[in-house]
Swiss-Prot record:
One of its GO terms (molecular function) is protein serine kinase activity. This is Probable serine/threonine-protein kinase PknB. It comes from the Bacteria. Belongs to the protein kinase superfamily. Ser/Thr protein kinase family. ATP binds at I15, G16, S17, G18, G19, M20, S21, E22, V23, K38. Coiled coil: none annotated. The active site is at D136. Its EC number is 2.7.11.1. It comes from Corynebacterium glutamicum (strain ATCC 13032 / DSM 20300 / JCM 1318 / BCRC 11384 / CCUG 27702 / LMG 3730 / NBRC 12168 / NCIMB 10025 / NRRL B-2784 / 534). It catalyses: L-seryl-[protein] + ATP = O-phospho-L-seryl-[protein] + ADP + H(+); L-threonyl-[protein] + ATP = O-phospho-L-threonyl-[protein] + ADP + H(+).
Length: 646
């Protein structure tokens, strides 16, 4: 049998389950959209703290809007077997998660893994910018869609598990998570954005090797290794790597997995940038910084960008700047990278020379330089950096909601690219936020409103509310926030409230109530009542029945109320009474007709002299209900000798 929640989401088959929830395929019947509905396990839903955390984290997830994040459309609670169970309505993604892909298709090459994890890092950066730490980055929470897209799931939901019970005491919920747990989380310390970066490094390790960096018989054993042990460099498990490629992939993975958060990439964007270099076989900043640190350990860093999250890539032959992860902390490095450094220092001519050959000597006749990282720099400073590196600079302008006016949004070719000196580099400089007036979408359908907002560069908030309305037809917009005409930044989100039509109200049972009171009650409820008076023996003005009683009708509906006029009385038994006695008996019963309305008909012949002029027939008959203003017909006995003879 079909199960519908919130009068909107029609649930179908279970498409996934985990230690804390079940996920159903579902349809949003309001707008005809396929969705997924995640429900908390009923035993966990009985914990008020757990339920509240789940609800709040779902709301946090709903704040995120990114193409690589599974969108959260709605949240709520539904009664199941007497327990209020929280649920989350999400975008339904058609595809497989990374764990399934690796199991079924095998490992990724480092370049393939980098291309998968770049959008993951971008999604994490969007989450971190919104103040949300994922806390449960793992292959099972990363989907590859049927069209090749990447979607990150379950933002913030793991926090509910951690708040309810220790991650290390609920084995069934953590065995998958423990393999991607950062050292600080394993020690019970708070997680931050760099904890997600550590987990992403663990995911990349698994993608390129086919196994997690640490394995053990229990979550405790795995967590211990995260804190105390260095992982085997992933290149040890990857065949057919050149020395430079091996160092490159090891540097990226092991930098992300550094034991101390200060030694990791400091932002997901920084890791995404290095993954981008890895994906195009350019030397990563992690590898470059490590080679230089080990080859010239006493040399100070030479130059820093004004942004601390990225390194300024120098021209060929010039010492590189430290990454924004911090100078002294990055020099500490993880022991895994120290091992790499030993290899590099022992084989300066071989491996380090290979870097020089592979990346800095692409042309025997033309000098090249790496494009320095000018993203986020003021225009003039970026111009100076690029000209000092030997490039011709072309400047274009573009509005941006994220980059302040006058700062560089991006470079083309991209930062870190090795190109010949004297080539042209185009930098795009922000003109600030582009503002636009919000269009009026009131009275539109949801589809038309979404299209109107999209046409001007605005985004429809997927959490669409519904309200009843006496004035606006069901399915049309009745309110928008921000209001129409307000000036906002292009790319802003607009929330809509849709009409569900006129409010429906249950018609009450008013039988036996006085009509005047019943009328007031119905009017106060929003109905338009009309009385229909019927002949009845009930007291005058008493309600006999109400049309559509017990059903729900739209507010403003007309209601017919049947009301007693009190005109029916019960006919008394007039047998063998005189007409005078009959009139008295009728009056006592409530008869209001004039005395002349007692109609005496043809006599009834009788041989009993005692019955002379007594009533022998009446209409209506005794106990019959009749109108109290109606005529009463009687026939009197008349003594007849002939009847005696007969």
């Amino acid at each position: 049998m079909t199960f519908v929640i919130a009068d909107r989401y029609e649930l179908d088959a279970v498409i996934g389950s985990g230690g804390m929830s079940e996920v159903f395929a579902a349809t949003d019947t309001l707008i005809g959209r396929e969705v997924a509905v995640k429900m908390l396990r009923i035993d966990l839903a009985k914990d008020p703290n757990f339920r509240e955390r789940f609800r709040r984290e779902a709301q946090n997830s709903g704040r995120l809007s990114h193409s690589s994040i599974v969108a959260v459309f709605d949240t709520g609670e539904v009664d199941k077997d007497g327990t209020s169970v929280p649920y989350i309505v999400m975008e339904r993604v058609q595809g497989r998660n990374l764990r399934e892909v690796v199991t079924e298709d095998g490992v990724f090459t480092p370049v393939e893994a980098a291309n998968i994890l770049i959008p993951v890092c971008e999604a994490l950066q969007a989450s971190h910018d919104a103040g949300i730490i994922h806390r449960d980055v793992k292959p099972a929470n990363i989907m590859i869609t049927n069209t090749g897209g990447v979607k990150v799931m379950d933002f913030g939901i793991a926090r509910a598990v951690n708040d309810s019970t220790s991650a290390m005491t609920q084995t069934s919920a953590v065995i998958g998570t423990a393999q991607y747990l950062s050292p600080e989380q394993a020690r019970g310390k708070p997680a931050d954005a760099r904890s997600d970066i550590y987990a992403t490094g663990c995911v990349m390790y698994e993608l390129v090797t086919g196994k997690p960096p640490f394995e053990g018989e229990s979550p405790f054993a795995v967590a211990y290794q995260h804190v105390q042990e260095d992982p085997t460099p992933p290149s040890d498990f990857i065949a057919d790597l050149t020395p430079t490629s091996a160092v490159n992939v090891d540097a990226v993975v092991l930098t992300a997995m550094a034991k101390h958060p200060a030694d990791r990439y400091q932002t997901a964007s920084e890791m995404a940038a290095d993954l981008g270099r890895l994906s195009r076989n350019a030397v990563s900043h992690a590898a470059r910084a490590h080679v230089e640190t080990e080859e010239t350990p006493e040399e100070p860093e030479t130059r820093f960008s004004t942004r601390t999250s990225t390194q300024v890539a120098p021209a060929a032959g010039v010492a590189a700047a430290s990454t924004g992860s911090g100078s002294s902390s990055r020099k500490r490095g993880s022991r895994g990278l120290t091992a790499l450094a030993i290899v590099l220092s022992l084989g300066v001519v071989g491996v380090a020379g290979a870097f020089t050959y592979d990346y800095f000597a692409n042309s025997s006749s033309t000098a090249t330089s790496a494009i320095p990282n000018v993203e986020g720099l003021p225009q003039q400073e970026a111009l100076t950096e690029l000209q000092a590196a030997g490039f011709v600079v072309n400047i274009v302008e573009e509005a941006s909601a994220d980059v302040a006016e006058g700062l560089v949004i991006r470079a083309n070719p991209s930062v870190g690219s090795e190109i010949r000196q004297g080539a042209t580099v185009t930098i795009t400089v922000s003109t600030g936020r582009e503002m636009i007036n919000i269009p009026d979408v009131s009275g539109m359908t949801l589809e038309d409103a979404a299209r109107a907002l999209e046409d001007v560069g605005l985004i429809l908030n997927q959490n669409v509310r519904e309200e009843t309305s006496d004035d606006v037809e069901s399915g049309l917009v009745i309110d928008q926030n921000p209001e129409a005409g307000q000036e906002v930044v292009v790319g802003s989100s607009v929330s809509l409230t849709m009409s569900s039509g006129t409010e429906s109200i249950r018609v009450p049972n008013l039988t036996g109530m006085n009509w005047s009171q019943a009328e007031q009650n119905l009017i106060s409820m929003g109905f338009n009542p009309t009385a229909s008076y019927l002949d009845s023996s009930e007291p005058e003005g008493e309600v006999l029945s109400v049309s559509s009683q017990g059903t729900e009708l739209p507010k403003g509906s007309s209601i017919t109320v049947e009301v007693s006029n009190g005109m029916l009385i019960q006919a008394p038994d007039l047998a063998r009474m005189s007409t005078e006695q009959a009139i008295s008996a009728l009056r006592a019963a409530g008869w209001t007709a004039p005395d002349q309305s007692l109609i005496v008909g043809d006599p009834i012949h009788t041989a009993a002299l005692v019955d002379q002029n007594k009533i022998g027939f009446q209409s209506p008959t005794p106990a019959t209900l009749f109108r109290k203003d109606a005529q009463v017909q009687v026939r009197l006995f008349e003594f007849d000798l002939a009847a005696l003879v007969q």
